[in-house]
Amino acid sequence: MKKIILAGGCFWGVEEFLSRINGVVSTEVGYANGRTENPTYEDICTKNTYFAEVCLVNYDENIISLKELLAKFWTIIDPTSLNKQGNDVGSQYRTGIYYVDSSDLEDILNSKEELQKSYSKKIVTEVKPLENYYKAEEYHQKYLKKNPNGYCHIKLD
């Protein structure tokens, strides 16, 4: 089982999209690479904590490779938009790929470099090791499964 943490704006839609991919075993939303300990949703929205809303993805690399997973991820974000996805604006909505296994870095950078060829604007999606991660509150987990008509900046169908 492999793990990658992906930030693509509001984590509700990112989680729903990723959870539908064959080979993704489990997903969880949370807050990553911020400046404080144990942040709440209110903290990341109103204070200068610099956490990103993220989706932690556990996947079976025998079914889907990181390269394939990232290719799907790139389709749901605007990688050239800094701190904004859809109508959501703020550093918590930045795009990012946070890795826990340093052997994944080469595949991540190659994927980003390949994608850059199809954009005239610079890709601003950050690629960093995971520094910290806190699971989001329970009401955020599988939000769009619990609230099928909930807000989502991603076209899921």
From Swiss-Prot:
Gene Ontology BP terms: cellular response to oxidative stress; protein modification process
GO annotations of cellular component type: cytoplasm
EC code: 1.8.4.11
Catalytic residues (UniProt): C10
Pfam families linked to this entry: PMSR
Major enzyme class: oxidoreductase
Keywords: Oxidoreductase
NCBIfam families: msrA
Described purpose of this protein according to its UniProt entry: Has an important function as a repair enzyme for proteins that have been inactivated by oxidation. Catalyzes the reversible oxidation-reduction of methionine sulfoxide in proteins to methionine.
Protein name: Peptide methionine sulfoxide reductase MsrA
Taxonomic path: Bacteria, Bacillati, Bacillota, Clostridia, Eubacteriales
Gene designation: msrA
